[in-house]
């Protein structure tokens, strides 16, 4: 996307379509993903996360490109965010978000080395607390300081959105350190969702939409070689291309069938609970005990019916399918754990 003219005093400092507001909205959502039901962006600076209990978190995003400008200018922008936040008396959190390192002075500076740094109001120095309270009283802002938080998000330089990429990668590495997709692609999909929401004043972004994109990216990037390695399968290299051809279509189609998925994963859970194998051996030991020639689905047998080693190849592929379903279950659970997300 083409870069637009930058307004250094608004939330809309841009990099390839990533406005600071969009980054801030996504981060607020991800940091509260376990509790979130929906979120939205409103106007040019407002961010709202609606929780499962229908309570809400309100945030204001203020950005600037000149970190060397005098502190008072940055502080004034923080106060502008407080003006709007104070009106949201029904919110349980009120967050002022900026990319200013020192909007409150040296004593309450944010960590420049971190992509995300958070400060609760009570953790600020007494001097800063009194300054904010005094300014709020002078302007008539009735802010509940027990709910008030300040966040710093690093968003500057030639490619400011790369801070978000590193932030996401640090989370995704906990799910799958050998991921085979670009986090930039995931960010681009999320950007499109948020951009559409910014123009759509009627509907919020559902948690399931963001999570579904994440689940799909992680699982659709799974390589056949990963599953082969999981179960230490010795596959003749001359058959790898045929297996690869059948792999994506069969796995994506059949692992989505609820009955198949739940039956396999239920048996897998029972096996793991009863035998308590080492984690690195779970998949291999399970498929060896679970996969029998008589249980191979007919569509797998049909695919290999013209091969000389059709029985062994069918069994090998069936083992890969069973291992993939169990792998998928564990990946989904890892995503939920890392992002604190549970199905409604």
Feature map (PLM): residue ranges:
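Acidic metal-coordinating catalytic centers involved in nucleic-acid phosphodiester chemistry
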Residues: 1-12, 64-318, 331-335, 339
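Catalytic centers of nucleases
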Residues: 15, 19-83
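Short, hydrophobic/amphipathic alpha-helical patches that form generic packing surfaces
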Residues: 21-30, 316-340
